A protein has these predicted regions:
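Alpha-helical hydrophobic helix detector
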Residues: 11-26
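N-terminal membrane-insertion alpha helix
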Residues: 25-33
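Membrane-proximal N-terminal amphipathic helix
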Residues: 32-59
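N-terminal leader/signal peptides at the extreme start of proteins
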Residues: 1-3
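Active-site-proximal cofactor/substrate-binding loop regions of enzyme domains
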Residues: 6
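Ca2+-coordinating acidic residues in Ca2+-binding motifs
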Residues: 9, 27, 79
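A short glycine-/small-residue-rich loop at the edge of a beta-strand within enzyme catalytic domains
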Residues: 31, 38, 67-71
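Low-complexity, acidic interaction segments enriched in glycine
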Residues: 52-150
Length: 150
């Protein structure tokens, strides 16, 4: 009767485990990347919805007074969080975001901004208003595009 494993059996078992582990690492990386992409989509959507709600409220005259050069858009992202005075109300504010979401690719709350007057592909912000946001990450998507174009 034989006890234990031979060297060949141990090498074969170790090789199988190593092969399975080598296949699992790329799958785990892919899942982490996919999760970050999903979080980026959600964060961008949340901010863009808040920007649109601010613009709608400004167009309806629900908030004010507004600066003329802002064209009805928020001057900063922080204004969406801190709130804007409601028109006709003494101490009431209209808040559009609870907090500025964290960019999952850069792990910061610092987003790239574009104003209404900026070129759509511009990476420098004119500062007049916040018309759109994008990630400041220089990483590329799986299909070769830029996350900053989302």
């Amino acid at each position: 009767m034989r006890r234990g494993f031979s060297l060949i059996e141990l090498i074969v078992a170790f090789s199988i485990l190593l092969t399975l582990a080598a296949m699992a690492v790329p799958l785990a990386r892919y899942k982490v990347r996919r999760d970050k992409e999903r979080q980026l989509h959600l964060a961008l959507r949340e901010i863009r919805i808040a920007i649109d709600k601010y613009k709608d409220a400004a167009d309806k005259g629900e908030i004010g007074p507004l600066k003329l050069e802002s064209e009805g858009y928020s001057e900063t992202l922080e204004m969406l969080v801190e709130g804007v005075k409601k028109s006709g109300a003494v101490d009431k504010k209209y808040k559009f975001l609870r907090r500025i979401p964290i960019d999952p690719l850069t792990n910061s709350r610092d987003w790239g901004k574009r104003s209404m007057q900026d070129d759509p592909k511009s990476t420098s912000w004119g500062g007049q208003n916040v018309f759109d946001v994008y990630t400041k990450s220089t990483e590329r998507t799986r299909d070769g595009g830029n996350y900053s174009d989302w």
